[in-house]
Amino acid sequence: MSSNPSSVEKKLLHYTGKAIADFNMIQRGDRVMVCLSGGKDSFTLLTILNQLRIKSGNKFEIFAFTLDQAQPGWNDACLRQWLAEKSIPHEILTRDTYSIVKEKIPEGKTYCSLCSRLRRGIIYRYAEENGFNKIALGHHRDDLVRTLMMSILYNGDIRSMPPKLLSDNKKHIVIRPLCYVQEKDIITFASEQAFPIIPCNLCGSQENLMRKKVASLIDQLAIENPKVPSNMLHALQSLKPSQLMDQNFWNFKNLEDGLETTQSIQCEEVFNAQEFELEDEKI
């Protein structure tokens, strides 16, 4: 921890530490691979985790992993210097996923899905080959609430980015220690620390992405009610299945069984769902 931490640094340490404790993200002896993309979020994550590691008495390890995807203009010289100055173990691995993405995705379409899929595969493989049991990602509170809104509006389901999950190959735990942290605090901290940010030219060149639209919508709502983002985050921790419509989580069809009555009720269906099916139509 800095000898004289700023107010925003104290805030980041508090909320990151709280998230780690709330979800039991890191345990004694863990080898945590921090995915350092070169953006403000991952720089903040690595810096704060390193301070918490020191505070814990080195009860866990951290390692910075950066994937150079061979994008034009990529320059990691400042990143290498920064990592060396911080004495943080690291590796910058070069894999040309850029050419694959450019070849497969038509001009004007978003590259994010394929790009992240390729990146995820490389990250999992590297973690497995090098004995890291935890993979830390830099998604923050606003990423979580934007993803929730996107899922509802564009996919028709309720999901977001979990704070902790088991990887698809069942070999790693993926954690998001910044899940309580506001993006504005990360921006302030990144400015204070003068991180050597490496911009993502691949994504930044594309306008009108869904995520930007949703972020703008949430920002507009927050002007009238500043609690909107935090309320959305709280909603992810306060599901009420009986107030929703998912029959996998609530037995709506047989609620009559729970009635407190002396009368005998016959729970025989008058209609069945098949009678009202329409082909290829969604309500």
Curated annotation (Swiss-Prot):
Keywords, sorted A to Z: 4Fe-4S, ATP-binding, Cytoplasm, Iron, Iron-sulfur, Magnesium, Metal-binding, Nucleotide-binding, RNA-binding, Transferase, tRNA processing, tRNA-binding
Short sequence motif named PP-loop motif, residue ranges: 37-42
Binding site for [4Fe-4S] cluster: C112, C115, C203
Keyword Cell cycle among record annotations: no
NCBIfam families hit by this protein: PRK10696.1
Other remarks in the entry: The thiolation reaction likely consists of two steps: a first activation step by ATP to form an adenylated intermediate of the target base of tRNA, and a second nucleophilic substitution step of the sulfur (S) atom supplied by the hydrosulfide attached to the Fe-S cluster.
Family according to the record: Belongs to the TtcA family.
PANTHER family assigned to the protein according to its UniProt record, in alphabetical order: AMINOTRAN_5 DOMAIN-CONTAINING PROTEIN, SULFURTRANSFERASE-RELATED
The protein's name: tRNA-cytidine(32) 2-sulfurtransferase
Biological source species: Legionella pneumophila subsp. pneumophila (strain Philadelphia 1 / ATCC 33152 / DSM 7513)
Lineage, opening ranks: Bacteria, Pseudomonadati, Pseudomonadota, Gammaproteobacteria, Legionellales
